[in-house]
């Protein structure tokens, strides 16, 4: 469970203890959507990259290889070779973003698979059963992620439905955890705050789900096209109504600068595909900004990706070499840059935690937030 160690303004330094290990927070969760991080990075590499938590996706694993298959193979941690905590997303975001021909009812959602078009039904109970089969450390409640922008009345009705779905998720998880064949009988459940960019809906919904006494709480439905300042405004509105004794998770966020600002507003956990996705397109995160390795100026550059970085890649390889690998279409280019970016994000969190430990987080933010947002 969550323990608050120190606080500076709204920023929190803590630790989150689970059956699969203790997470030092604030922390970044490395995204392995289908059980692997894109870019040929395995669980074997993740310890060297200082990863604490891996995030896998319920929707994708349900479709392929199938959650029953993963259960037969010992659960997601045994299946992937990762022995630390794993969070599984509920599948809700993918149902509402990838799947076609959705039909939303009180029972749940019927949708067409983005792989083969077959019709699938998923509701709160189905999402919990799939995540129970996966045996993750943390399961996310099934919710509706409403498009942005959305009509106020639709967003209001969706919030109410998501809260009702959460009650069903909690009941089903209690039942599943009590089963003798549960992969992880200590599986935790996080609720998700929704409400688009409407402050009153966000606050009302957060108050309602806070009363359910869950293991943690997430802010969802942000970083989906709204201006960055809108996202910060919603976090500031919701944060005072989140239980102080529970861990807080901002879903799908974000850039290094977003993370600094999120921590400043009281967030403990983050996840984003950006470190691996940007790396696969030749973009390396550094303390000076995001470096585009496709640029010709790196053709003869013998410096590492980041001269202040201690990752395995920066200890051995040059910008010129990785630039060449991208131009030559070599897979190693993606692997090396993904490894660097994941290390950078995890090291950023280490620096954030140290700044909080030493009571200098605000000055740390002011020193780095502008540079981290640059493109170089």
Residue ranges and their predicted role:
Residues 1-183, 296-299:
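Non-catalytic, usually N-terminal nucleic-acid engagement modules in DNA/RNA processing proteins
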Residues 21, 54, 89, 131, ...:
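Conserved, mostly hydrophobic/aromatic
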Residues 126, 130, 134, 157-168, ...:
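A non-catalytic, amphipathic alpha-helix used as a structural packing/dimerization or gating element
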Residues 136, 167, 171-174, 240-243, ...:
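Generic secondary-structure signature for well-ordered alpha-helical cores
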Residues 148-151, 156, 216-222, 331-334:
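Glycine- and acidic
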Residues 160-163, 172, 176, 184, ...:
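Glycine-rich phosphate/ribose-binding loops and adjacent secondary-structure elements
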Residues 172-182, 246, 352-364:
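Surface-exposed helix-capping loop/turn segments at secondary-structure junctions
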